[in-house]
Amino acid sequence: MTTPQPESRKGLILINTGPGKGKTTAALGTGLRAVGCGMKVLMLQFIKGSWHYGELDGVLPFGENFILKQMGRGFVKVGGAETDPEDLRLVEEAWEEARLAILSGDWDLVILDEINYAIGYGMLDPEKVATTLLERPEMVHVILTGRNAHAKLVEIADTVTEMREVKHAYQKGILAQRGIEF
């Protein structure tokens, strides 16, 4: 492997996908690393919104350097239900905020948490997302999370990581643990 030259540095598109847990957690870890290196981070959660997750308080000490916004109402399309118009409206609002943030260049890293679900449920056009990612300022990094990443986004991404479950405590009847899984 050759050593990257300074002129080869650029903003990256990263995707955390797959059926295993840890996609959001990995993105948060990258966000923490970025803040530690003096970068500004915006994380928009497209689906989460009705629960109070630990990361909401975890980023508070970073002030304006790490902003996390829940944009949804929580679970959508549960049990094969039709898309609720309110959920669709919230995804559209989240996407517009994400698009403007990415294109503004005000953020070094923009994390689009659970965007793959919004795309997979037909709530957001993957072509719109791809176009914005390709038009972003050169040094803006973007992370997309959620299962079943769309093929178009995988194609344009620089790094794609697929999480897979090998073993999960839930299989032993152990419920999700606050501070570890939410």
Regions found by a protein language model. Give the residues of each.
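Short, glycine/charged-enriched secondary-structure capping and boundary segments
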Residues: 29-30, 56-59, 84, 124-128, ...
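Conserved nucleotide-binding/hydrolysis micro-motifs of P-loop NTPases
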Residues: 47-51, 74-75, 116-117, 148-151, ...
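Hydrophobic/aromatic ligand-binding patch that stacks against planar heteroaromatic rings
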Residues: 33, 58, 132, 152-153
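Extreme N-terminal, non-catalytic leader segments
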Residues: 1-13
